């Protein structure tokens, strides 16, 4: 790649456990690329096992960016991520390299791909809604959200306290439905980026999710969470609400048995994968390949019109 103006970054998206990491590594090797993470929980330092973060020794010498940049005590910020990720991609392009953007965090991907004026924030308003949720519970607050903004309630899971609070905050601050503040879909992507999606039907993906979750617990997820608690991880933090981490924290609190924590992590991950499939399917710019194809890397290169030089 001799000129950054000729390079169209590639984003590899799709549900969790569909094989995005493996394909991104192969594409990076094929295209002289560097990987840019767009998984919101992989931004946190120390959250390795439960986020399926690629260990340094398995990165095959390929530079990885936007990993391990936040402490677990920091509230997540899509706007802050976008600013840093744009700078990272621009720097990679300036060196004539191919950015391979990979992950499944829907809002983060949307923010990087599309031009988006973020809705306002107000810590006082957010704290008000957070206190209300702490008293009434997430299910009741989600039900309230459904009465004032049915579309917001449709796209936000009824067990997602953070997004429920954020929607109520935005509605109060803007006086408009939450969806009105969401980014446009299907416009020309930033950098004329190519979007590659891994299609993974539930009957194929669900066993992979269970296998991955059980492997995470076998590899030491409980010990990882225990060490992060010493660093300030708490159930009230963004990081502490991550699937797997929240369940282990409940296990520590005596609210779940070990096996219940495992089972709820599996269930929560499957629900999240359903949301991801639904979200990405609405984006008509995505080029889809079968995650279960005999040679997904070849399918990816053919779908993207990439001719191997090897």
UniProtKB/Swiss-Prot annotation:
It catalyses: adenosine(37) in tRNA + dimethylallyl diphosphate = N(6)-dimethylallyladenosine(37) in tRNA + diphosphate. Gene3D superfamilies: 1.10.20.140, P-loop containing nucleotide triphosphate hydrolases. Signal peptide: none annotated. Substrate binds at residues 16-21. One of its GO terms (molecular function) is ATP binding. The keyword Magnesium applies. The keyword Transmembrane helix does not apply. InterPro entries: Dimethylallyltransferase, IPT, P-loop_NTPase. Pfam families: IPPT. Its EC number is 2.5.1.75. ATP binds at residues 14-21. One of its GO terms (biological process) is tRNA modification. Monomer. Belongs to the IPP transferase family. This is tRNA dimethylallyltransferase. The lineage of its organism: Bacteria, Bacillati, Actinomycetota, Actinomycetes, Mycobacteriales.
